Amino acid sequence: MEQTEVLKPRTLADLIRILHQLFAGDEVNVEEVQAIMEAYESDPTEWAMYAKFDQYRYTRNLVDQGNGKFNLMILCWGEGHGSSIHDHTNSHCFLKMLQGNLKETLFAWPDKKSNEMVKKSERVLRENQCAYINDSIGLHRVENISHTEPAVSLHLYSPPFDTCHAFDQRTGHKNKVTMTFHSKFGIRTPNATSGSLENN
């Protein structure tokens, strides 16, 4: 039996084209998508136009809408920026590092009682690594723990979603939050609210 070779995207545009092919059907091959995203070697000249930072919090910048099958976006993390603990609304979530490092902390789903949430693991994601999570794996928080270097990550969500739940680590209490885009296709979104952007 032949071993299928991982296509190596030469550019970000190439990666997007391959992702469109991979998501053309109804099934998602998680391992294949993760391998393709990891195989792309980050080149800032290809993604800099999407990398729009905010002084106070991380930003979500839409790159491609994946024919309705997925959203591809670039998240920009200033020094010390981080997300809340959150779920992924029954979607697949792929996170590939383009620049810098991010710390991912994985949590178990809270039980019904008001107890502190249980930390399952933590790891540091480095440039060109690609991680995967879905709701059956657990919840996570992502943080740029550097106080000197920004971080940039490429995220794919399938199917796309615009709300999720953010969790209080001390009690497990959850709130529904709506995510907005800081920019779309390299253009700053007018009136993007900075209040309830919680997702990555």
Curated annotation (Swiss-Prot):
Binds 1 Fe(2+) cation per subunit. Zn(2+) can be used to a much lesser extent. Ni(2+) can be used to a lesser extent. Induction: In hepatoblastoma Hep-G2 cells, down-regulated by phorbol 12-myristate 13-acetate (PMA). Its cofactor is Fe(2+); Ni(2+); Zn(2+). Highly expressed in liver and placenta. Low expression in heart, brain and pancreas. Also detected in hepatoblastoma Hep-G2 cells. Fe cation binds at residues 86, 88, 140. Keywords: Dioxygenase, Iron, Metal-binding, Oxidoreductase, Thioether bond. Belongs to the cysteine dioxygenase family. Catalyzes the oxidation of cysteine to cysteine sulfinic acid with addition of molecular dioxygen. Its EC number is 1.13.11.20. It catalyses: L-cysteine + O2 = 3-sulfino-L-alanine + H(+). There is a cross-link at residues 93-157 (3'-(S-cysteinyl)-tyrosine (Cys-Tyr)). The thioether cross-link between Cys-93 and Tyr-157 plays a structural role through stabilizing the Fe(2+) ion, and prevents the production of highly damaging free hydroxyl radicals by holding the oxygen radical via hydroxyl hydrogen. Changing residue 157 to F: Almost total loss of enzyme activity and iron incorporation. Reduces zinc incorporation by 20%. It comes from the Eukaryota. InterPro entries: CDO_1, RmlC-like_jellyroll, RmlC_Cupin_sf. The keyword Iron applies. One of its GO terms (molecular function) is zinc ion binding. Pathway: Organosulfur biosynthesis; taurine biosynthesis; hypotaurine from L-cysteine: step 1/2. GO terms for cellular component: cytosol. GO terms for biological process: cysteine metabolic process; inflammatory response; L-cysteine catabolic process; lactation; response to amino acid; response to azide; response to cAMP; response to ethanol. Monomer. Gene3D superfamilies: Jelly Rolls. Coiled coil: none annotated. This is Cysteine dioxygenase type 1. The lineage of its organism: Eukaryota, Metazoa, Chordata, Craniata, Vertebrata. It is an enzyme of class 1 (oxidoreductase).
